[in-house]
C-alpha cells in the first residue's frame, strides 16, 4: 500500500483556487446530455466521479468534446438517449449511479448498472421502490435493495410517488431530474424528514437553469409540471467545490491563516458553504466575498480566544461536517456533531471509520446512529499515527489537518482522486514549517 508522510507544520496561510463542485459538475453533465442544444461547460471538476459520468454518457450516445483542459462541449439528446442497451460501470460515484438509475428507468431501454464492491453495499432500494411506482421495471442482480441493477424497457405512468427522505437526498434529486422526461405531471411526496436539503435545492436550481421548473411545498411535496423540456443554457461555469473548501478554511482556523479560497463564496448555491458558520461558532475569523472566503485563527480577534468546542446540527453539511471532526482535535472541550446518519452509507461507514482513526490519535470518541462526540486528548496528539483512509477521499483530506499538530502518515493518499486529484499539492502549498 502506498502512503504519504506529512511533517509537522506550524502555520497555514495562502490562497487556493478550488476545483469545480462535484455535485454541480455531475448534475450539469447529466442535464446537458438530456437537453436540446449544445452546452459549453467551464471549470468542470476533473475527477474519478465526473469521469464515470462522462464515460457513461458517451456509452449512451451523447457527443462529448473536450476543447481544452477546462472546457467540455456536450450535445444533448433532447430527452432520449440513442443507445438503448448498455452495460455501465460507475465506480463508487453516487452522484452518477443514483441519477442515472432514475433517468435510464424512463428511457425504454435495457441497461446494466454496476460499481466497485463498496457501491454494491450502498442502499438504493428507496429509489428503486419509487421508480417502480411509475412503472419502471428494475431487477436486483445480487442482493435486494442494493446494486448492481438491471433496468428493463417499461411503460411509464407518472403519478403520486412516495419516497423516504432519511437515507440519501440523491434519491430525490435523481427522481426530480428524471421525471420531466415522462412529459406528464408528477408529484413526489417525501416520507419522514428529508436529509441534506441543500443538495435538493441545488438540483432544483440547476433544473431551472435548463428551463424546467419544480414546485416545492415545504420539504414534503415536490410537483414537476408536465410538458417541460430541458433546453441548453448555452454556457455554464461550475463554481468551486464548497466541500473541498472546508479543509483549507479549517487549516486557516487551526494554524493562523489567513487562508483564502477562490471560486466559492457568499453567493454560492451549495449547502456546504454553511461550514463557515461552524468555524465562526468555534471562534475562527471569517471574511467572505461573492466568490471567495478567508479564514484565520481566533488569535486575530481582540479577545484572543482559541478554538472552542461546539454542538452542531450537521444535516445541511453532511460532507463538510467530516472536517469538523478532525478540527475538533484542536478545540477546547467536547464537540458534538449531530444528524450525520447519512455518513453510514457514504464511501465507507464514516462514523465508524472516523471514530477509529480519531482514537488512534488519543481522542475520546463516543458515537451513535446519527452523532459523533469528540474530546481531544489532554496530552499532545499521538505523533506519526498511521491513518487508514478506507478508500474514502474525505477521510484522507480530513486527516491531513492532523499535520498542523503532529506528523502523520496517510495510507492510500491517491483515493483523493475521487474528487480532488491534486489535493495534497495544494494543501502543502499553504502549509509552512
From Swiss-Prot:
Localization annotation: Cytoplasm
Enzyme class: transferase
Catalytic activity, reaction form: 3-phosphoshikimate + phosphoenolpyruvate = 5-O-(1-carboxyvinyl)-3-phosphoshikimate + phosphate
Superkingdom as given in the UniProt entry: Bacteria
A Pfam match: EPSP_synthase
The protein's annotated pathway: Metabolic intermediate biosynthesis; chorismate biosynthesis; chorismate from D-erythrose 4-phosphate and phosphoenolpyruvate: step 6/7
Keywords, alphabetical: Amino-acid biosynthesis, Aromatic amino acid biosynthesis, Cytoplasm, Transferase
NCBIfam families: aroA
Function, in words: Catalyzes the transfer of the enolpyruvyl moiety of phosphoenolpyruvate (PEP) to the 5-hydroxyl of shikimate-3-phosphate (S3P) to produce enolpyruvyl shikimate-3-phosphate and inorganic phosphate.
HAMAP family named among the record's database cross-references: EPSP_synth
Record text on subunit structure and interactions: Monomer.
The protein's name in its UniProt record: 3-phosphoshikimate 1-carboxyvinyltransferase
Organism this protein belongs to: Nitrosomonas eutropha (strain DSM 101675 / C91 / Nm57)
Gene: aroA
